[in-house]
């Protein structure tokens, strides 16, 4: 071939294959640096080949290094570090263009992430008034679009939340203030109630002792009535016995009258006998003189007997009259005692009524006392609850104030309107 | 997809494999790519912070690494064929390594890029390394 030896042809063939293997990355080392062509014209070509193959290997190395560095940098990108770019310049134009594109992507993404980070830092400083916006070139449905839309949704949510929080806080502050007032009113009412209950308890004590005294007096009256009843009964008995005695006196008087009548009769006959004796004596003369004196004496005695009998009769009549009178009095007494007994019975019944009424009163008082005690406990409970409610109201006010202060310390869309609106209504200092 | 096929104890790298690692000034690994991890049988966490001799194979002569270090310390690029050991096994793989000295923000480091060597390249390396200590 062109006057080239077959050995040189073989070497040339090997060298051509080797060149392509190396440049396409199938081999690493050029094995024919030291081989020589015997044909003179080929010796010069060999020099060119040697130089160019070394250049080619160098270019390969440059590209390799650039790719290795790219891998290192991309790993850092993968790990979230966007601040290092690919520095080495590859020999291959395509690789270089690729590297520039990669670097551009890293820079753009870094700037987009930086925007987001800055925004989130602003949010972290409690300023929710701004957001990041889509770029014109952002592809619909892409991750960035989702991210930015998500940020907007989050911003809206936070703003709404803060608006609600501020509004609720102000309203809560107001409500808690009202609650506190109501609780204070309740507390005052409870204290007043406690005072009146104390008075009531005092009055009840007084009433209790009154009723107890009443009951005692009724008891006294009952025993007095019983004593009186006994006395009246005794009186009635005595009156009865008096009446019996009077009757006996009358019977005795009648017996006396009968005896007197006998005596009068005897006196009369004695008088007649003495008269007869005097007449006989006179007849007898002096002999009868002494006898006449005796007869006269007998006559005198008979007359005196008759007189005495008259006196006794009169006295008996008087006694009869007195006993009659006594009878009447005894009868009246008996009637009087009966009236008294009736009255005592009525009194006893009245006293019983009073006693019953006192017992019922005592029961009523007992119930009232229980009720008052319960009311007192309830009032104390109320006062305690009022105190607790006051603590809660205070805590609520504190929390509401903290809530309002917290919300008001943040910057968000709609804050000024709420502040203005509510300040106007509630006159709250936000 | 695996970057090698096994042939006995040898892991034969695929044509597309590209193993990269980086060490600091003292040869402590500070970066390794997926191909490197796969071939050597380590996870990246196991490699970072370790000396690069973690993959050293006993068949490799000291002289090779002496040359490597002398070259890169001079600020020159080193290349050569290296037999490496796989983690916890008698498996190994051959690479053609190119080691670059790097100066980044005043800090020295070294990046090694590895490609698959062809059979005759490995064979002549075996012969060469037999003559070295
Ligand atoms: C960037 C870089 C990559 C390295 N890659 C390897 C490697 O793949 N395999 C290896 O055995 N040594 C590699 N070394 C060399 C090791 O640092 C070490 O010198 C070698 O494993 C010998 O270990 P020794 O120094 O503990 O004897 C690399 C060194 C550098 C700087």
Where are these regions (language model features)?
Chain B
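Sensory/regulatory domains in signal-transduction proteins
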Residues: 9-131
């Amino acid at each position: 071939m062109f006057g080239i030896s077959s050995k040189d042809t073989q070497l040339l063939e090997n060298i051509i294959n080797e060149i392509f293997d190396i440049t396409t990355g199938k081999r690493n080392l050029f094995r024919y640096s030291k081989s020589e062509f015997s044909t003179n014209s080929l010796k010069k070509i060999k020099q060119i080949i040697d130089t160019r193959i070394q250049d080619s290997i160098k270019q390969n190395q440059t590209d390799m290094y650039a790719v290795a560095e790219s891998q290192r940098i991309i790993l850092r990108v993968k790990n979230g570090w966007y601040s290092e770019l690919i520095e080495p310049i590859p020999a291959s134009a395509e690789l270089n263009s690729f590297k520039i594109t990669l670097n551009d992507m890293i820079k753009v993404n870094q700037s987009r992430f930086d925007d987001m980070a800055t925004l989130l830092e602003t949010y972290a400083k409690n300023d929710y008034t701004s957001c990041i916006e889509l770029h014109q070139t952002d592809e619909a449905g892409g991750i960035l679009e989702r991210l930015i839309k998500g940020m907007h949704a989050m911003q809206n949510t936070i703003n709404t939340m803060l608006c609600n929080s501020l509004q609720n806080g102000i309203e809560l502050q107001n409500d808690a203030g009202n609650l506190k007032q109501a609780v204070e009113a309740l507390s005052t009412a409870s204290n007043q109630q406690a005072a009146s209950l104390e008075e009531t308890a005092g009055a009840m004590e007084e009433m209790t002792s009154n009723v107890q005294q009443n009951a005692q007096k009724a008891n006294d009256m009952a025993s007095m009535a019983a004593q009186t009843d006994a006395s009246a009964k005794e009186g009635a008995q005595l009156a009865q016995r008096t009446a019996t005695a009077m009757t006996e006196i009358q019977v005795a008087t009648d017996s006396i009258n009968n005896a007197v009548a006998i005596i009068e009769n005897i006196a009369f006959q004695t008088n007649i006998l003495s008269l007869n004796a005097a007449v006989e004596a006179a007849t007898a003369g002096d002999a009868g003189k002494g006898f006449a004196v005796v007869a006269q004496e007998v006559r005198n005695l008979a007359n005196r007997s008759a007189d005495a009998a008259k006196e006794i009769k009169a006295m008996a009549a008087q006694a009869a009259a007195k006993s009659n009178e006594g009878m009447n009095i005894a009868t009246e007494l008996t009637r009087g005692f009966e009236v008294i007994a009736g009255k005592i019975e009525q009194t006893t019944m009245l006293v019983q009524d009073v006693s019953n009424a006192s017992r019922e009163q005592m029961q009523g008082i007992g119930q009232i006392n229980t009720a008052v005690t319960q009311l007192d406990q309830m009032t104390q409970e109320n006062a305690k609850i009022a105190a607790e409610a006051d603590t809660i109201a205070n805590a609520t006010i504190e929390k509401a104030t903290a809530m309002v202060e917290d919300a008001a310390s943040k910057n968000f869309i709609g804050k000024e309107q709420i502040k203005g609106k509510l300040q106007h209504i509630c006159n709250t200092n936000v | 997809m695996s970057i090698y096929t096994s042939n006995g104890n040898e892991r034969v790298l695929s044509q597309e494999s590209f193993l990269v690692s980086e060490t600091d000034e003292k040869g402590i690994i500070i970066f390794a790519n997926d191909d490197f991890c796969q071939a050597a049988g380590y996870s990246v966490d196991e490699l970072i912070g370790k000396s690069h001799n973690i993959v050293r194979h006993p068949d490799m002569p000291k002289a090779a690494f002496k040359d490597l270090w002398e070259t890169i310390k001079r600020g020159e690029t080193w290349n050569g064929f290296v037999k490496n050991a796989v983690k916890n096994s008698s498996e190994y793989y051959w690479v053609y390594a190119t080691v670059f000295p790097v100066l980044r923000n005043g800090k020295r480091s070294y990046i090694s890029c590895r490609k698959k060597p062809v059979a005759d390249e490995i064979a002549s390396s075996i012969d060469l390394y037999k003559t070295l200590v």
